[in-house]
Each structure stands twice: as C-alpha cells, then as structure tokens.
Amino acid sequence: MPDKPARFSKKPGKQGGTLAQSFSSIKHELYAGHIKYMLIFSLAPIFPSMKDSLIADAYPLFGFDSIFLMGIAYSLGIGLLFAFAKLENIARYARHVAMFMTVSFMLWLVLPIGPLATFAGIVFSLLFGGCSGFQLFGFACALNDTERLVGAAITSLFCLLFQLFIALVPLGSKNGIIFVALQVLVSAKCLTLYQGQDFEHIKNKSIEGHGKQLAPALFFFFAHRAIVFFYSYLPTSPSLLISGFSGLVVFALCIIIYVAAEFKIWHMCNMFFAGMAVTFILRLLLPNSHGALAASITQGFSHMGFIASYYLLGLVIGKFVNLRLFKWVLAVIFNASLLLHIIPGLLATKAPEALPLVGTLTTMGLFVLFTLMMPLMSQQLFIKAAVQENAQEKHQQLALNYGFTAREEEVVKCLIKGMTYKQCAAQLHISQNTVKFHALNAYRKANVSSRGELMALFLDE
C-alpha cells in the first residue's frame, strides 16, 4: 500500500491533462500478475430477478425458502472460515476452501430438488462466503489503489453484461444458476493462484491510529449493502434490458467522473445515495409496472455504490488493518449483514406492501447520516496532505518527467534512501518481487542501469 491515503488528487503538473492521458496513467499502474486479486466475483452484486430465478428451483426448509437460508449461510461463512486463517498457510487454506466450495456447488446442482439439495446449497453458500473472505483479503492487501478501483469496476461490469445477456438470450429459470456458476468458476481459479509471499508485509504491520479512517469507510460499506439488500426484495423490473443498459450508462458515468474529478471517489458516494433515493421514491410513489420501469433506470446507481464501497473498504483495510483486525472487520460488517437478510426478508413475507416505504426511509436516513459525517470523511479519506518539502517537490517533478507511476515513484523514494528490496517491501507493504518489478521499470524509464546511477540522478538535483 502507498504511504499516502490514496491518489484522490493528481500532482500539480498533471492537472491540465486530458481524460485520455488520465486513462493512460491508470493503465500504467496495473500489474497483470495481480488480476487474480482484482476479480472479486464472489462478492459481485446480484442483478434484478436473480433471486426469483433461484427460488424457482428452491425447496423450503423450516418454513423458509432455501435462498433465504443460503444468504444467511453466505454471510456467516465470510467471517467464520477466515477466522482460522494464518499468514503462514493462507494461500494453501484458500485453495482448499475453493476446492470444497466447487465440489459442494456441483453436488447442489446434481441433487434432485428436496431437503438434501437445500442442505447441500447451504453448505455451498457457507464455503462460498469463505471464498469471499479470502478474495476481499487479497483485494485489500495485495493491490494498489488503482488496481482496486479497476477490480471493483470489472466485477460490477461482469454483473451488468450478464444481465444484458440474459435479456437478449432468455435462459428462463436457469439464469441465476448460470450466474452463480460463473462466479464459482472465476473465484475458484483466482483463489488457486494466490501466493503467500504477496501477504508477507502484513505480519509485522502496525495498526496504530486506524479507527478514524476505518469507521467512515465501514459506514459507507454497510450503508451500501443495506440499501441494495432492501431493493433486492422489491418486485423485479419489467425490463432487464432497460435496467442493464441504464446500469452500463451509470457505470461509464462512474468511471468518467472518477477520472475527470482527479481521482476523487467523493462524488461517486454522493451520486449513489442520490440515485438510490430517487429509485426508492419512484417505487413508493408509482406502485405499479410504470414505477418499476422508471426505477430500473436509476437503479444502476447501485453499481456506483458497489465500486465506491469496495474501493474505500480495500483502501482502509490495506493501509490500517493487519490480519487480526481484518478478521474482526469481517465479523462486524458481514455478520451484521445477517440483519440485512433477515429484516427485509421477513418484511417481504409478512408485509410486502411496506417494503418501498421502509426502503425509502432507510435510504434517506443513511443519506442524512452520510451528510453529517462529511467533515470527518473528508478529513480522513478524501483529502491528501499537501507536500511541503522542496526536496519532495523536486523528486515529484523528476518522477513526472520520467513518467513514473505512483508505485514506481514510491519504490524509487525507498531506493535512494539506501533501503534494500526487503526493506522497501516492508515499508510499502508489498512483496519483494513487486519491488523488483517496479524498480526495473524505473531504471528503464530513467535510462539508468544501477541503483547508484539512480541515486546520483535524483540526489544531484
């Protein structure tokens, strides 16, 4: 992780750049070897009608539909299975959980509809939740800020494209199963590629003073999940095509705003709340198919919230959380999600007509709380401290002239201090291989062949 909170703003010399140049700079901060940590498909948002398609083949148990019980098992599994993880064996443990998860999914598919299949589905959901915990850990601790943004965006785009696909190629009641199968396939493949060395920097990590930064990000993450969970229990949109297409428009708007606003996530958070508030109000004021159709256009803002929430969560976890605290974070935010399954689920069963009103009040209430927390969140998450030292400014100007990425700039700072690769890795919370990769790139861009030449180049200035 970088020393600074995040690259929410550009360097002064970059502010006049075009959108194309900004997108190009993002590309240079992506490392192909990290794709396995970027694809958090086990945490992908659900699409309208997915839940209904799964319920169609579900066998109720204890008076509840199996999908409701599987949702509870999923939330429990995220924190429960990761609680036994240790840094020494985390990659091997993740592979084993992924293997058992895949087997249980296949078992759930082949068993005839009945109590046994429902039980297999609950076991699968528990293990799938465990995989989500590992994927969130890799997402937060092995990636830089840009990779997290792109990873969350790809995961959201996966959901939107699948939604458009089933709108154009109807799969009937099987669309939910196929979506879950794709999640399982990608997640299992990514988890089998995890490498323990990418998490070595967590071992001796200090977490002093983490609370002020962690709390606002956890609030926004929980708020996003609460709003989306309530909306998922409303009757589905009459047009998946319109919902999917509008979601793609919002997705494109999300990325453009992020880049045009100089890499600030703040605007995405505000637009998520505003968009979802409008969505619930439309469902409340127009309780018919026309209201559902109108709401499906603005419902795409939920994807903006997904990207922003996981970006911020990954940011604060990667910088301020060690393994022990990460387990507590999982227990708090995902086990608390049990209420987000139970409350709207029971409400949908006992008083479905009250769901739009309760969802609207919940969204507006969380929006008000978010507004009240703006000063704290602005100070802790959205403002990068100004650089004051002249030597620092000179270093940044040279890095800009040579076209260094943010990570390469950080590695160079460590190298010219005389640090070894191992010390650089500990300082930046990345692996030694990653340090070597960025150091060689910096040598090439600066047209030097050794650390001595690099030090002379910067220190002479």
Please state what every model-predicted region is.
Residues D3, G13, F41-S53, F105-M106, ...:
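Linker/hinge segments immediately adjacent to helix-turn-helix/homeobox DNA-binding domains
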Residues D65-A85, L248-I256:
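Central cavity-lining transmembrane alpha-helices of secondary-active solute carriers
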Residues L80-H96:
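Conserved MFS/SLC helix-loop-helix module at the cytosolic interface between two early adjacent transmembrane helices
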Residues L116-G133, G291-F306:
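Hydrophobic core of transmembrane alpha-helices in multi-pass small-molecule transporters
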Residues F128-A152:
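Cytoplasmic helix-loop-helix junction between adjacent transmembrane helices
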Residues T146-L168, K327-P344:
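Glycine-rich segments within core transmembrane alpha-helices of 12-TM secondary carriers
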Residues A406-V411:
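The N-cap/first-turn positions of alpha helices
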Residues G418-E453:
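Recognition helix of helix-turn-helix DNA-binding domains
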